[in-house]
Amino acid sequence: MKSIFTARQATLLLVLTASFAHSGDWPRWLGPQSDSHWKESGLLEKFPASGPVVKWRVPVRWGYSGPAVAAGKVFVMDYDITEGKPDANPGGRTKIKGQERVRAFDSATGKELWTHAYDAPYELSFPAGPRCTPAVDGELVYSLGAEGFLTCLSTIDGKVLWELDLKKEYKVESPIWGFSAHPLVVGDLLIVKPGGEGTTAVALDKKTGKEVWRALASKEPGYAPPVLITHGGQDQLIIAHGEAINSLDPLTGKVS
């Protein structure tokens, strides 16, 4: 049986009930608090026998990115392959060429509002597109591609506000399964995980992309996204990778 990730073209669906259409946003991976908790009331306990109502659907290309929903827009990443085949190649790296795209749709109608595309050759295992869900913060949307290309775009028109190639900036290699740790907005900071000596976790000014702090050392960044928790009255930034789990002060990057 084919999965949505092995089909040549997937479809982005918006499945709604009347009450859901006016409920809260889901602006990043695992929701507003990154806890996978939907706080709205009146949700269906089970779908009707005929299935949920599909309000609209649009075709998207390759990728593993989930949708982010905020301020009447749906944001998703995909990968438009121009050369090669995205063979799984477990344990090895497959070379293909294409463009990563950040796409914005009207959440009520599915109308495409804008697309930002850039060249992104891959050399990865399972090279079928970006892994990370966009993160929306006000009028800014952040995306991280499978080869570590980070962008900050305007949610209004897709204009590039700043961008950063994590591999070049921090002199690291792509993990074999690609950069998969979803970016996390914490106050005025954007937290990312490049990996490497002293740069396993990095905080950037979310408006400019300038580095604020860097912390920890690891061979690879791992695949777990950064998580913000509050414990004992103190905010803690949890960073997990293949060698350790650390709790950092999110403002300074110091081990707490």
Feature map (PLM): residue ranges:
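Noncatalytic, solvent-exposed loop/strand surfaces
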Residues: 22-256
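Intrinsic low-complexity, intrinsically disordered segments enriched in polar/basic residues
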Residues: 2, 14-15, 46, 161
